[in-house]
From Swiss-Prot:
GO CC annotation terms, alphabetical: plasma membrane
Lineage: Bacteria, Pseudomonadati, Pseudomonadota, Betaproteobacteria, Burkholderiales
Disulphide-bonded residues: none
Primary role: Catalyzes the transfer of the diacylglyceryl group from phosphatidylglycerol to the sulfhydryl group of the N-terminal cysteine of a prolipoprotein, the first step in the formation of mature lipoproteins.
Main location: membrane
Organism of origin: Paraburkholderia phymatum (strain DSM 17167 / CIP 108236 / LMG 21445 / STM815)
Cell membrane in keyword set: yes
Topology in membrane: Multi-pass membrane protein
Protein name, per record: Phosphatidylglycerol--prolipoprotein diacylglyceryl transferase
Positions bound to a 1,2-diacyl-sn-glycero-3-phospho-(1'-sn-glycerol): R142
One GO molecular-function entry: phosphatidylglycerol-prolipoprotein diacylglyceryl transferase activity
One GO process term, biological-process aspect: lipoprotein biosynthetic process
Assigned protein family: Belongs to the Lgt family.
Subcellular location: Cell inner membrane
């Protein structure tokens, strides 16, 4: 059983300015996106599409705006709508935290539509190029969550080799013992709490780094190294992220103000299901469309 290091949320002190880890991870995310984007320019089939380093820089400018605005307003709408309706000015208190990936995804989608329109490209050409650049940024964001000791996982057995104690969850842990007496007795968690004043939990942020970051990046990078039908890489991203997030949510603690919803699924899982379905439909469409185009070309020749 491990204990979370309980890092200082401030990474760097610059006089009166404090650079927080989560903000630093945003910077790391966009730097990694630039690096991956530049590497993609070396692929012959990508270079043949006319992409340039300036495109990457401009794309990231749009992406930053879409991520921040979409992520914030997505959190407001999907997770705490009633609270922000009663306290509308709190919407702008971004330093207090509260970002939604699914909201950020919608924000980036809209931003890429604007970018595609400006560059006179199709939206799917842009999202296919961007898709392999995203997982590295997701991993950086989840690392920021882990450093901050937030978005921890569900309570687990103290005998699990991955079990971790999160100081920030101490108040919730005390309540968990009351609401889950049978599970607490089975795992002897009262003894653990008496010793540490915390309960062992899944480090779900690390699971997300592994699945949404490393695994999804490898899948997308390998998939997109060869020419694919327009929309295929975007579809693989939707499927891959949706499956990764849906899976990790079984180990991640649901938001305390929402809990589990219909069918015992979390909000994150319900928001991921449409991504998976849309990805499957888009992938089938992309390859069928490509097959029809190839058949028509063969007929003409």
């Amino acid at each position: 059983m491990h204990i979370h290091p309980n890092f200082d949320p401030v990474a760097i002190h610059l006089g009166p300015l404090a650079v927080r880890w989560y903000g630093l991870m945003y910077l790391v995310a966009f730097i990694m996106a630039i690096v991956v984007g530049r590497l993609r320019l070396r692929l012959p089939h990508v270079a043949a599409q006319g992409w340039t380093p300036k495109d990457i820089d401009d794309m990231l400018f749009y992406g930053v705006l879409g991520t921040i605005l979409g992520g914030r307003f997505g959190y407001v709408l999907f997770y705490k709508a009633s609270w922000y309706f009663a306290h509308p000015l709190d919407v702008f208190k971004v330093w207090e935290g509260g970002m939604s990936f699914h909201g950020g995804f919608l924000g980036v989608t809209f931003a890429m539509i604007l970018f595609a329109w400006q560059r006179k490209r199709t939206w799917l050409q842009v999202t296919d190029f961007v898709a392999p650049m995203v997982p590295a940024g997701l991993a950086a964001g989840r690392l920021g969550n882990f450093i901050n000791g937030e978005l921890w996982g569900r309570v687990t057995s103290p005998d699990a080799p991955w079990a971790m104690l999160f100081p920030g969850a101490a108040n919730e842990d005390a309540g968990w013992l009351v609401t889950h007496p049978a599970q607490a007795a089975q795992w002897h968690l009262a003894d653990v709490f008496a010793q540490y004043h915390m309960l062992p939990r899944h480090p779900s942020q690390l699971y997300e780094i592994a699945l949404e970051g490393v695994v999804l990046f490898l899948v997308l990078w390998l998939f997109s190294r060869k020419p694919r039908p327009v929309g295929a890489a975007s579809a693989v991203f939707l499927i891959g992220y949706g499956l990764a997030r849906f899976t990790v949510e079984f180990a991640r603690e649901p938001d305390d103000f929402l809990g589990l919803l219909a069918l015992g699924l979390s909000m994150g899982q319900w928001l991921s299901l449409p991504m998976i379905i849309a990805g499957v439909v888009m992938l089938l469409w992309a390859y069928r469309r490509n097959g029809r185009s190839a058949a028509q070309a063969a007929g003409v020749s």
